[in-house]
Amino acid sequence: ADGLTPQQVAALILVGLGAQAPSTARALADLTAPASAAGTRPRRPSETGAGVLVPPSRSLRAGDDGRLRLTVLGARPYEVVVGQDLAVDVVRGVTGAPGGGAGGVALIHIPELETRAGRYEDGLRAAGLRVERITVPGGETSKSSTVLNTLWEQLGRMRMGRDGCVVAVGGGATTDLVGFAAATWLRGVPVVHVPTTLLAMVDAAVGGKTGIDTAAGKNLVGAFHPPAAVVCDLTVLEALPLKELRAGLGEVVKCGFIADPVILDRVMTDPADIVRWDSPALSELVARSVAVKAAVVGKDLTEAGPREILNYGHTYAHAVEAATAYHWRHGEAVAVGCVFAAEVAHRMGRLSGDVLALHRQAFSAAGLPVSFPEGAGRFEELVEDMRSDKKVRAGAIRMVLLDDVARPARGLTPDAAVLREAHEAVTGAGPGTGE
């Protein structure tokens, strides 16, 4: 995919969705033509992870039942299904996992999802499976060694074998915690994720990252443990507060910038429609975002290289979260983090002013913040937080930046002056170049 225009990238993803529009055909017919380098400088291959961006042809499959399906490739391929009222797909995920759930099914959920978990339990029992319901606290505080130990004890009491299966029903914290419990029980049993927030659907539940927090920081203890299946049941979003839904769009828009320009078009064209849980537009955005992530993690599960591009915007976002004591939602911080990264890239001569402005326009259309006034005068504090970022090497802040939409570059080390100018632009303490 390196060297493709954004239109060609979008066309390939449209083919994955089964589209056959004339514009799609024209873009695909031009694949042999090199991308225009106007406004950008040539990049060395080592700088970019763009070579894994495009999902395999037909990777996104639209069924007659209205569901969108996608296979995440890798050593242990698994299916992601997106749609509404997917209780039957939860059962299919379990019975299709190694062992088929014969060794028992641990259905782990947060208290607020008692009723929905009950529906999944009914379906699993109807399939002849032995089911144990386990409740865990919601939110980041659940990702602790104490809660994890409780899960181990309960898995032991139910005598779960290697032919058993764990089902996680909840947000990103729940899928992180339960995924790690599954990764460590008997050195690994299958897990099926049923994410119940938009953020979890497009981010935490797909990719195989699991873990808990410690006193030293977030997600410092964990494992890569790909799920046996991911079921994105959009019906659960009906009860999600609008602000939480919008926060999930932060990762969606990020995916648009790093790989799929069609996402940006949908967000800016239908800003009201994309926050309706039952809208086809939202279903498409979830599927497209998952396709972007799947294309990357299928080639780089353990974040050895190209997977870093999924961290676009996260260097500054994590600093924003820390500076606000995590009062900012992750997707909100990612939105500002992407604007910061665009400011950095523009000041380094990599990114046009138009694409910088597009960052503010797209995230604003999604109802997300594009500035961080609380950070004014706190540059040194945020830089210190950025030095704790996992991409740091030998003390140097390394970032994922864009040369254009769908043209990410990784492993870049901006100097302190550029970082300060970008920080001042997003905090309002200095001139912004994309207003």
Language-model regions, residue ranges each:
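C-terminal peripheral helix-coil segments that are non-catalytic and often amphipathic
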Residues: 2-43
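Solvent-exposed alpha-helices and their adjacent loops that cap or buttress functional pockets
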Residues: 100, 159-161, 184-186, 212-214, ...
